[in-house]
Amino acid sequence: MSLELLSKLETKIQATLETIELLKMELEEEKQKTSALNEQNQQLSEQNQQLQQELASWNDKVTGLVGLLNSEI
């Protein structure tokens, strides 16, 4: 009986260790995905800032041109 219990315990421990290893691998994959998403987020934030600056520049140019048209009318 004692050997049977030890065998069952060993089986459960082995299954638990395998589960832990799988979870570690999944965690590593999620960390890599998170890192890639953070990098993509940073790039998109920089692109957004650049586009906002370009939009502001164009708005200034259009405002200047409208001002010139109004002064000539």
From Swiss-Prot:
One GO-annotated biological process of the protein: division septum assembly
CC annotations in GO: cytoplasm
Coiled-coil intervals, chain numbering: 3-67
Coiled coil found in the keyword field: yes
Cell compartment(s), UniProt: Cytoplasm
Keywords from the named record: Cell cycle, Cell division, Coiled coil, Cytoplasm, Septation
InterPro entries linked to this entry: Cell_div_ZapB
Similarity field: Belongs to the ZapB family.
Function statement: Non-essential, abundant cell division factor that is required for proper Z-ring formation. It is recruited early to the divisome by direct interaction with FtsZ, stimulating Z-ring assembly and thereby promoting cell division earlier in the cell cycle. Its recruitment to the Z-ring requires functional FtsA or ZipA.
Oligomeric form and interacting partners: Homodimer. The ends of the coiled-coil dimer bind to each other, forming polymers. Interacts with FtsZ.
Protein name as it appears in the record: Cell division protein ZapB
Organism: Shewanella sp. (strain ANA-3)
